[in-house]
């Protein structure tokens, strides 16, 4: 049976371990005369606007959707290299060796191979430096973008971020029918901080330029806190089509908060941005009973007690990471007071988007 995207996990390991393996892999590739490519693709953090990137809202509600998001320096690495034989070998949380593309269980990779016309004699490995399923960081889309980028390079094509993002949307939404939005693919492909607008005519990416000082402040004051719970976006978003008046009103409010978030970021008012995240979270919790639960509410209250002035759960909900804002000393308090399973990760911005870091 073909796996759904929600059930696919990328091999998760410490990034340092993977990077230490690269010289040996390249040496082997050179010795046997094979061609190796490595792509690096960031995941993302959405400040405001999540949910309005769904076609059911963006293409049907006046004004469309808008998201303020930033790519972060947590990556999906994809290696692509030739094989001696004509088989296809995949390595992620499991191993696959097949004779044809159609036999591949990993639906994202299967469709990426079809899209790029690569049909045999290839090996693909995906490695993530964070858990890659149900974290609310858009990791499935980062996988799709990263695999496409590496495969296009494999066939000698350098493609634009827009081409990668559109291709990933076609695979995940149009071909596989995943009930997800379109922000993750664009955030992963473009990198940096952006206002991403969604409407019936397409997607528009508008970079938000940050000064060096503002980048440093954001990286000091914002943290990610792992909930130790995961839930696939598809599971949360697989609900009846948008037609409930209250839900549409809430999504309009979330879209308006995205406009306000951009103003606060550009002005450098990060404390007010943290407060806005709290307001966004309260609105988002009313979208579906699957967005939050008692454990998540308890953890969020604990984060506020420890000094956070606001935050929100990332992604569709149900688990993953909280994005939290507080003073410069908040992170150390979180590390000291939270249990080990609630890992605290500094926010570090990626400015490059999906890129090829090795080709030989």
What is each of the regions a protein language model found here?
Residues 137-157, 161, 189:
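DPxDG-like acidic metal-binding loop motif
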